[in-house]
Structures are given as C-alpha cells and as structure tokens.
C-alpha cells in the first residue's frame, strides 16, 4: 500500500496518508493510457470540415455546350468534379469523431495514470485547500510552497469557486473536482495536487 506525505498549504508536512493499492499502486499500462488519451482527443475534435458535392454546387443544370462539333472535350455540367469550382467527390462532411472505450478500460487507464503519479513522486496530498477570496497571487504562493508552480493539476473533492478562480489565470495550472479527474489532464500536468477528501472520493469510485 503506497504511503505518501500529507502537507498543508504552507508546504509543511503534517502527517502521512495511505493510498489504496488497487487505485494508486497498480502497474502502469502505457497501451491503455494511449488508448484513453486518443479517445479524449478524438472527442474534442470539432469535425466541421465540409466540401460541396454534386447536389451542393450551384448551377450546372444546363449542358455547357453541344456534344459534338465544337472541337472541345464533351461536357455535361459545370458541376463536374473535373471543373474548377465543381463538386468534390467523397470529400469530408461534418461528423462526430468521438467514441467511447469500454468502462473497464477507462477505469484501468485512470488507475494507471494515478499510479504513474505515485511511482514518479509527482503526487502532493493536502489536508485541505480553501481560500477566503479569489486571488491568483495567493494560489501561486501556495503552489510555490509545494514545489508545484509549473504545470500542476489541482483537484478538490467538491467545487471550490475561490480556488478555481485563483488557479484559472495561472499558466499551466488547471483546476478539477474529483468527479472530473481524467487521464489526459493527469498526463498533461507534471504535478497532481489533490486534497485528502478528493483522494477518498477517487478511491471510493475506482477501488
């Protein structure tokens, strides 16, 4: 069972926390992590690329010139894909690129991402994280105390509006609740700063 230090917002160690081995102590499955990241990025694609087909190009109802006798190549419509400004055959159309991996695979990927943070020593557990008012400077100071000022993912058990607003303007810092924790954000940020209550919520869902 992994055991990590418990810190306060001043960066002082105030205890230790035992993490659930089935959630934070498993093997890191890189293939599953890759599949999960590709799935998330595919779901974010806009899918708005579009070309005009035969039915979409304006004009072309009349034959441009008679079939024979002009010396030119025969033509039936200015909408032909051979013509400049004509139709595009089998071109892209608006579509949804999103898809879903099986639930067991998604959970395995999330457990692998969390285990990678523990393995690399990039998880910081806080006793609590609350702010009386939103202030970016205060949030930057807290992260500096924790040696997590660059590319940190901040996770709390419930929505903390003041924490969220304070973290929003810091480059490389992202705020999530434990319900929104995901593989892409875990891998995209160097440090995971998570409260003790959020750890309990994550373990409750994934254990």
From Swiss-Prot:
Name by which UniProt lists this protein: Large ribosomal subunit protein uL4
Molecular function in Gene Ontology: rRNA binding; structural constituent of ribosome
One record GO biological process: translation
Entry-linked InterPro entries: Ribosomal_uL4, Ribosomal_uL4-like, Ribosomal_uL4_dom_sf
Family: Belongs to the universal ribosomal protein uL4 family.
Described function: One of the primary rRNA binding proteins, this protein initially binds near the 5'-end of the 23S rRNA. It is important during the early stages of 50S assembly. It makes multiple contacts with different domains of the 23S rRNA in the assembled 50S subunit and ribosome.
Gene: rplD
Chain residue ranges for the region called Disordered: 52-77
Record keywords, A-Z: Ribonucleoprotein, Ribosomal protein, RNA-binding, rRNA-binding
GO cellular component: ribonucleoprotein complex; ribosome
Subunit composition and interactions: Part of the 50S ribosomal subunit.
Annotated Pfam families: Ribosomal_L4
Source species: Moorella thermoacetica (strain ATCC 39073 / JCM 9320)
Origin superkingdom: Bacteria
């Amino acid at each position: 069972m992994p055991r990590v230090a418990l810190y306060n917002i001043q960066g002082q160690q105030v205890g230790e926390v035992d993490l659930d081995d089935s959630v934070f102590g498993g093997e890191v499955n890189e293939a599953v992590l890759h599949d999960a990241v590709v799935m998330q990025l595919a779901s974010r694609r806009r899918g708005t690329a579009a070309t005009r087909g035969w039915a979409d190009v304006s004009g072309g109802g009349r034959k441009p010139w008679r079939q024979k006798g002009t010396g030119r190549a025969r033509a039936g419509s200015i909408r032909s894909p051979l013509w400049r400004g004509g139709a595009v055959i089998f071109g892209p159309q608006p579509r949804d690129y999103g898809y879903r991996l099986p639930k067991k695979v998604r959970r395995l990927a999330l457990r692998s991402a969390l285990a990678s943070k523990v393995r690399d020593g990039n998880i910081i557990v806080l006793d609590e994280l609350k702010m009386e008012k939103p202030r970016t400077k205060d949030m930057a100071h807290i992260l500096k105390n924790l040696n997590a000022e660059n590319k940190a993912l901040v996770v709390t058990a419930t929505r903390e509006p003041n924490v969220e607003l304070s973290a929003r303007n810091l480059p490389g810092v992202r705020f999530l609740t434990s319900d929104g924790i995901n593989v892409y954000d875990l891998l995209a940020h160097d440090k995971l700063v998570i409260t003790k209550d959020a750890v309990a919520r994550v373990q409750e869902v994934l254990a």
